[in-house]
Each structure stands twice: as C-alpha cells, then as structure tokens.
Amino acid sequence: MEAKSIIRRNAYAAWASMALLFGVYAWLWYRAEGPAGGQDSWNHFLYARWAPFHSELLLDQWGKPLFTLLALPFAPMGIDGLYALNMLATLCTAWLGYMTARRLGLRNPWMFIPLFGLQPLVLANVHSALTEPSNALMLVAIVYLLASRRLAAAAVLGSFLPFMRTEGFILLGAMFLFLWVRSRARYAWHAGIGTLVFAVLGALVSGDWAWIVRQNPYVKQEVEKRFDPGHGGFWHYAEAQREIWGPLVSVLVMASLVWVLVYVFSRMKKKTPRELSQMALWLWWPLFLSFFLAHSWVWYSGTYGSHGLLRVFVVVAPLAAFLAHYSLHRLMIMDVAILNRILKVGVLLALLLTAYPGAHFPYPWESKSPISGYAGASTVQQGLDFIQREGLLDSQAGSTPLLVHQLPELNAELDFDPWASPDQAKSYYMWSIDKRPGQDWMPKGTVLLWDNFHARRDAPMGLHELRALGKYQELAYFPSDIDSVYDVRIFLKTQP
C-alpha cells in the first residue's frame, strides 16, 4: 500500500513538473522575437521546407538526414512548426527521462524533469529549429531502452545517432563500451546498422562510395579551409557551466563522479554490482565525458568548424540530469526526512532561479519587453525594406533580378528556394560569387545585401573584396546601433 502511495505521489509530481515546463516554454514562445541558433535555425527550416521538392536534401549531412525527415510534417506550418517540434521533443525528453529514472529506482524520479528541463542551455534553445533537442530525445530513448535491458533495440537506435548530429559517432563509440561490458560482442554489431544503411544510400544516390566522409560538412571544412571557425581555451565549456548546466546541476554532476569512485572502490570488496551505479559508471559518464572532451579539443584546436558554440551541450543535457539525479539519490537514500524535503523544494527553487539568468533571459515578472533574437535583425530588415521600396527586385524586360545574400532567414521570409535550378533561381548565397578576376557570373542588375557578420564570416566576402570586384555600386548603408558587425549595405551590379 505504501509503495502504491509513493508511486502515485511521484506521478502527480511528474505531471505538475511537466505543466511547469510547458508554462515556462510557452512563455518563452510568446516573448521571443526569433529562434535560438539564428541563421542555423532558419537553414534547418529551409531544408525541411524544400526537401519535398529536392529529395537529395534528405541525405544532406549539413541538414542532418534524420532531423530533416522528422521535421518534414512540421515545415508546412512555417518556422512555428519547427518551434512546436522542438518544444515537443524537449517535453518528451523530460517525460522519458522520468520514466527511465523510475525504472532504475532513482528516488523521487519526477525530479529528472526539472533537472533536465530547467538547465539554462535547454531553456535557451527550446525555441528553435535546431537539431539538438531532437538529438537529446533520441539519446534519452536509448538510455531508456538500455535501462529496460533491450540492448539490441538500443544499439540499432544508437546506430542512427550520427545522422541526427555528427557527434553521434562519438556517442556511438561510448555506447559501444557499455554494450561490450553488458553483452560482449553479442549486440555490439547492431551499433553499425544505421551507418551502414546511410553509407549505402548516400553512395547509391551520389555515386560516391566515400560519400559518408567526403560529404560530411566538418570534414569538408577541414579540407577546404573556407573560413576560420576560431579557437579558444580547452576549458571553454567548463568555464561556461553557469550558462550550460547551471551551478546546481554542475555541482551535482561533479559530486556524482565522487559517488561513482566510491562505488568502484566498494566493488573491489563486494562482487555484487548495483544496477544504478553500473549505469552511471559504464554509460552516463562515458557518454558525457567523451562528448565534453571531444568538443573541448575541437574548440581548442580550432578544427571542424566548432565556433565554440555552447548549444551543442543540449544533446547531453539528459545525461547531466541523470548524473545530478544520481547524486541526489545517494543523499536521499540516507532517509533523513527533513533533508529529503529540503532537497526537493530547494533544488526546484534553485533551478528556477538560475535558469533564466543562465539563459540570459529576464524573469517573467521583470520585463514585458520581447526577448530579442538576432542582434542584426533590425539592420537586415531595413536593408530588405529599402530593396522592396525601391523596386530593385521588380521584373525588368521579362526577368526578375537575383537577390544575393548570406542569410537563410531572407529565403524563408521571401519563400525563395535556395536549391532551385539556375533558370528558376531567385536568390543565391554570397559564396556563389566567383571572386577570381573576370569570373563573376552574376548577371547585371543583381541586388546584393551584404551584412558584416554572416557575409564576411560564412561566404567569406569581406567589404574590401566586394568593392575590389569593381562591378557593384553601393546604394545604401544601414549602420547598427549595437555593433558595427551588424552593419548592412545594399549593392547593385551595374556591369555584366
């Protein structure tokens, strides 16, 4: 009877926690001016929007094949459809994590929900069209299957991780360790099924049997060196822990390492393993640590287009929540009633109070102003308004001038197909301009919207390079009130 009462109370607390998360995320949707992830979010939307017309996009490794496929039914609703997808993915991750915690016997399994859903980075990126929230859902589903001892199903699902995000290869390697410990080689081979399927599909469609390597955008970046992604300190992500996991989850994650080491030493004396500690030792920590070390090294070495983006850690946010929950569990099994009550209330309050500043959002009661999106949105809009007001894209002599830029958001706003054939194209990205002397093939009358951030970094097309082409007349300049990096200039190609 007592066990049923505990289960019922945990279920009520879980539903209340889910309602809290839904309210927090709905508030964010209402207040946000644009998606987290900026142009990357818009680009993922464009992949899903135009994939029905260009089937090759379903195998594009920048767009991430699994995510594009998942986003297809949501894309007809516009960018809001992908906001809904990521909000749903985040809520499902929270719920499935709770179910996993309950299955593993963690005390107060409902606590996984706020431990995951109120991490600052999760809060900061739920309102987006990025791949990270869906990847987090996929990862927690794998953990749930492993906790349920469905090793073959977990291995097969895990084998598709690299096609939700490229770091899936790192996670797959760590998962292979767990499968080997649990089953030796019996189920380990299942972990290669997804890679084999996509490698063969990609090779058949592209005609390149090295497609999986040659078309990987990060490998191509290393080979082509089109732009400098920057680099920084090895401990860049550790130093940003307040913005990633928040101070409480960070402390609890590190405490879990101590508890795991205590367990390892105790296992030297006792041969009977504890399932929960085995999961922390052989699954959660290897997955979490391998992901952390891989990204830290990539940023430190300035390779594979890292940019030092924090948002990638949304992928392993469920693992941080499991490890934090494991630490709380070890405290709660001491069965000190007053301590357990303080922990439950204190943890929830601490998570709520640190999530908003960590995500760089105001508290709901602090401000009624919208949460701003891309800092350069104002000058970009001024530039687009100028183009439309001056009729620069109006049809002339039976043809419509091209718009050249480096902002996927513009293609989404104008409903331009970035993958259209040359005879139907209305827009090109700025990296399409051939900067070699006499090789610029853009037709006379082409309108160019140059911004000092994406065009300069991603194309890359510096202002001096554009002017050096000698064929583009500057029509307007829109300086940013925030930073010159968000300046926008409008050019017209006056010579063929």
Q: Which residue stretches match the model-derived regions?
A:
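Transmembrane-helix signature of polytopic, membrane-embedded enzymes
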Residues: A13-W15, A94-L121, A136-L137, A153, ...
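Signature aromatic-anchored transmembrane alpha helix within multi-pass, membrane-resident enzymes
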Residues: A14-M18, R107, M111, G192-L196, ...
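Membrane-embedded, lumen/periplasm-facing catalytic core of multi-pass transferases
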Residues: P52, V345-N411
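Specific aromatic-rich, kink-prone transmembrane helix
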Residues: A94-M99, L115, S134-G158, F176, ...
